[in-house]
């Protein structure tokens, strides 16, 4: 059987090219190559599938944010209606806090309710060491400058907390908590009652994703200092 001679201008070829030429000339290993190709293709599909499932691949899209509103809830429409009676009534119900938190996440201001909840939990501490550790954690997360979830409170209140954080008490965050409470009550809470998140609950309908709104202007406590709350402030 005649075999064609093949000449190469370059004698120093990479190993992969030599292997490819060897297989082409001898015609062997075709079946094995086909199987390996299928395996490699499957592995690529699996890697791509995993990549597409990563949140950081897509970024924080509107769909992923709005999906938070579709979270299943077991609250009855009758119970949800009571949340409109007062902000205090909403916060006294776990499902109310959950629904309000999901709403605030669509406005990128969930740090307010998270701080309020953290303060409520902090006031239940019994052991001195636990008080110190939790106070420090709250301060670093919500109060200090450039905190990861810094709440919008006045400079004087921040200074008072900063000076007392070395020897905290169960009342160290009372003033800041009441400020944040009033901000939510007179701002976010009113929008929540008009939102699809809440309207779907009182109508007993499944929630659906809604268009996101950009973060609203950050109000300060001074914006509401002349407004008197009709419910008890958390002190």
UniProtKB/Swiss-Prot annotation:
Subcellular location: Cytoplasm
Domain RGS, chain residue ranges per copy: 86-202
GO terms, biological process: G protein-coupled receptor signaling pathway; negative regulation of signal transduction; regulation of G protein-coupled receptor signaling pathway
Record keywords, A-Z: Cytoplasm, Phosphoprotein, Signal transduction inhibitor
Cystine pairs: none
Tissue distribution of the protein: Expressed in bone marrow, spleen, fetal liver and lung. At very low levels expressed in heart.
Phosphoprotein among keywords: yes
Entry GO CC: cytoplasm
Protein's job: Inhibits signal transduction by increasing the GTPase activity of G protein alpha subunits thereby driving them into their inactive GDP-bound form. Binds to G(i) alpha-1, G(i) alpha-2, G(i) alpha-3 and G(q) alpha.
PANTHER family, per the entry: REGULATOR OF G PROTEIN SIGNALING (PTHR10845), REGULATOR OF G-PROTEIN SIGNALING 18 (PTHR10845:SF155)
Protein name: Regulator of G-protein signaling 18
The species this protein was found in: Mus musculus
């Amino acid at each position: 059987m005649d075999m064609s001679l093949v000449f190469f201008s370059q004698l120093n070829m990479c190993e992969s090219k030599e292997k490819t030429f060897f297989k082409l000339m001898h015609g062997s290993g075709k079946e094995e190559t086909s199987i390996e190709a299928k395996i490699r293709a499957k592995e690529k599909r699996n890697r791509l599938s995993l990549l597409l499932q990563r949140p950081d691949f897509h970024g924080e899209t509107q769909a992923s944010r709005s999906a938070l509103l579709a979270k299943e809830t077991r609250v009855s429409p009758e119970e949800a209606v009571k949340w409109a009676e007062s902000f205090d009534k909403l916060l006294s119900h776990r499902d109310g806090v959950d629904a309000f938190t999901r709403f605030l996440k669509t406005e990128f201001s969930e740090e307010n309710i998270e701080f309020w909840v953290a303060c409520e939990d902090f006031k239940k501490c019994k052991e001195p060491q636990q008080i110190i550790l939790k106070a420090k954690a709250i301060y670093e997360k919500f109060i200090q400058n450039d905190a990861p979830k810094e709440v919008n409170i006045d400079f004087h209140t921040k200074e008072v907390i900063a000076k007392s954080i070395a020897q905290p008490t169960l009342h160290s965050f009372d003033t800041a908590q009441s400020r944040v409470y009033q901000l939510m009550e007179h701002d976010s809470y009113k929008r929540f009652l008009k939102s699809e998140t809440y309207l779907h609950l009182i109508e007993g309908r499944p929630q659906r994703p809604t268009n996101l709104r950009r973060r609203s202007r950050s109000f300060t406590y001074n914006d509401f200092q002349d407004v008197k709350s009709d419910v008890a402030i958390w002190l």
